[in-house]
Amino acid sequence: MDPPETVRGFILQPTYRIEGGRPVVHLYGRLETGETFLVRDRRQVARFYVRSRDREAARAAGVSGIAETDRRTLTGEPVDRVEVARPSNAPPLRDRLHRLGIPTFEADVRFAVRYLIDRGIRGSLEIRGPWQGGHAAGAAASGVDRVFDEPRLAPADWTPRLAVLALDIETDPEAERLLSIALHGCGASEVHMLCPEGAGCPAGAIGHASEAELLAGFARRLRELDPDVLTGWNVVEFDLRVLLRVAERYGGLLELGRGAGAVRLSRSWRRGPAVASIPGRVVMDGIQLLRGAFIRMESFRLDAVAREVLGEGKTLASGNGGREILRLFEEDREALAAYNLTDARLALEILERLQLVELAVERSRLTGLAPDRMGASIAAFDFLYLTELGRRGMVAPTVGAGEEPPGETAGGQVLDPRPGLYENVAVLDFRSLYPSLIRTFGLDPLNLLPEGAADPGGLVAPNGAAFRREPGILPALLDELFPRREAALAAGDRVTSVAIKILMNSFYGVLATPACRFHSPPVANAITAFGRQILLWTRNRIEEGGRRVLYGDTDSLFVETGEADPAAARRAARELAAALDRELAAWIEERHHVASRLELKFERLYLKLLLPPTRGGGRGAAKRYVGLVEEGSGRRTVFTGMEVVRRDWTDLARRVQQELYERLFAGRPVEDYLRDVLAELRAGLLDELLVYHKGLRKDPSEYTSTTPPHVAAARKLPGPLPEVMAYVMTEAGPEPAGHLRHPYDYEHYIDKQLRPVAEPVLDLLNKSFDALVGRGYQMGLF
């Protein structure tokens, strides 16, 4: 045993194991020395709470181990602590109490997460105590460098650089037979391939004589490379799931961790993505990292994302599928190895270019959650709020234990657009509106007064909810986060600024979500009610000053500047935003007696802006507009809510819409262009632009009452079904792309793809789409 020392580390995986009949916390991670570590602690007791007045009823229900505490509920009632021998004993006991009408508190907090909450540890920690090498500390620690048993822990400020390894496998068309495995990262870039005796193995590939040997060799090599993070594209749902299936077929376990234990797949909720657990490591799927970072992509397929982010794609077209992979395995293994390795490399390079692993680490350091839980906004809120509640001697209800049914929440204010084509339109934006409202008015579940309760000095929101004028948990957290984000922006630290922005913006959504223990319709509605009040106040002040507001949505207003020169328009917009900011602060101080934390900024200038009418004319269409902006030395057309940015429209519609608005803004003719498109379409020259893409949310056989086009096409597709169905409309209905038996239905595309994108532009020019298409044209039925 080495002498005590103090060292900083970062937690990759908080979990626990049962040892000697008792739960033992296990924290796996990486130290600032570069070594890996495991903290083991037997001192944590699994617990939850019940109201003190329910003590005897709980005992009658078979609950033992009840002890008095000095803690209270959010409404001020005293509570008792219920201790259980194992964390797994808590759920059935909790559910039994709920069935008897006895509410519980914090009976659903994960055991290892509770350990971190109790100590205020978020991601990074300081460890002080003796340690021993992992090889001498038992099977659970065999793959780590240092093992600390019951050390002293404290929060720390340290950011690690994690070792990341990308994995990609290739299989036969049925995803039953494993053909090759590529690994890229941690200093390696290699392909392990099934090469039975007598079969040639390509130069540079590592051959294995059987599928079982291929799997074992891969697992051994992964443990040698010892990554902190295992990643890939759809790596959990496909790669790891297939590898587990292969391991089961050979009667073994898939062991890839830093300690004893097989890879496990699970779902945190029924329709959520699968998550993988590997002892001591984190599995981060590239697709989920993108989505968790709120990065929008036209398609999340690896080829599409790689082309958009890196400027290069896969070496084979994705439409070739498993049959092409099998052909390469049989005829050209060198090409298969190159394809396999390219997929692994692209997956890792996308994460590196977008700094997605760094973002996950920073979000872990902010929220306390493990870095593979990027999308868990409710759990992040839970961690932060429960930590602060604990410091105040309070407990929160168990999710689902509340006595009141979930209430409805109202959204933000949307002003009816004034349809038309405008010049020099300024967008004024309230920065981080909902977090700023929480800070300004002290909106917090802890400050919410019970309905009907009187507080002469309280603050009343526009929805009627009343709040104490006391420091709340959320306002205090935001008071800490806002300056940290400003400092990160000033330092050019994009990762930290994005992580903080995502966290701050999640607070309102969590309060409005019934699945959250702190779900509070009065608080959520107070936030949006203040938002609506302030947006309308700002709109009225602008129009009282003689300018028109053309559109508004939640936190932004589109203002007609009335200036002919763009430079003058920008100057006027900045002056207007600054003046409104001052007036609003004075109004809030006078009306509500609080200091405004709101900030209205000039965001951008549209040199030209089109607000289209709804289909059928009349009113403007909310959340749909297109404008021309200056960027650097050039100009760019920006679409919001239009067909060009939606995946369920074809490339034909997107390409035509883009070109039409660029021509409209540039004053170039559109009719001749549309005639050319129609002629090329009917001549079959644009067939590659006619593919629809639609996700398959369930098996086609499960659609019984209706059959959407993509489902009808899927039923005609031979072989395994993709996650996203590619299909075209033919004269015989929808058919899978690449498997057509009938001619394209060009009139369908004219009616359903060209008409919707062309008519708004033609209407502005007083032109008719039907006249352009040709005399006697009738709308198709489908």
What are these regions (language model features)?
Residues 2-226, 341-342, 346-365, 369-411, ...:
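DnaQ-like (DEDDh/DEDDy) 3′-5′ exonuclease domain used for proofreading
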Residues 167, 200-205, 224-229, 287-288, ...:
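Glycine- and acidic
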Residues 4-8, 16-36, 351, 357, ...:
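DNA-dependent DNA polymerase catalytic subunits
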Residues 335-350, 480, 484-487, 530-537, ...:
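A non-catalytic, amphipathic alpha-helix used as a structural packing/dimerization or gating element
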Residues 191, 200-205, 209, 226, ...:
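Active-site-proximal helix-loop-helix substrate-binding element of RNase H-like nuclease domains
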Residues 255-256, 281, 305-309, 313-392, ...:
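Mixed-charge, glycine-rich, non-catalytic linkers/tails in nucleic-acid processing enzymes
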Residues 218-243:
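Proline-aspartate-enriched helix->loop->beta-strand connector
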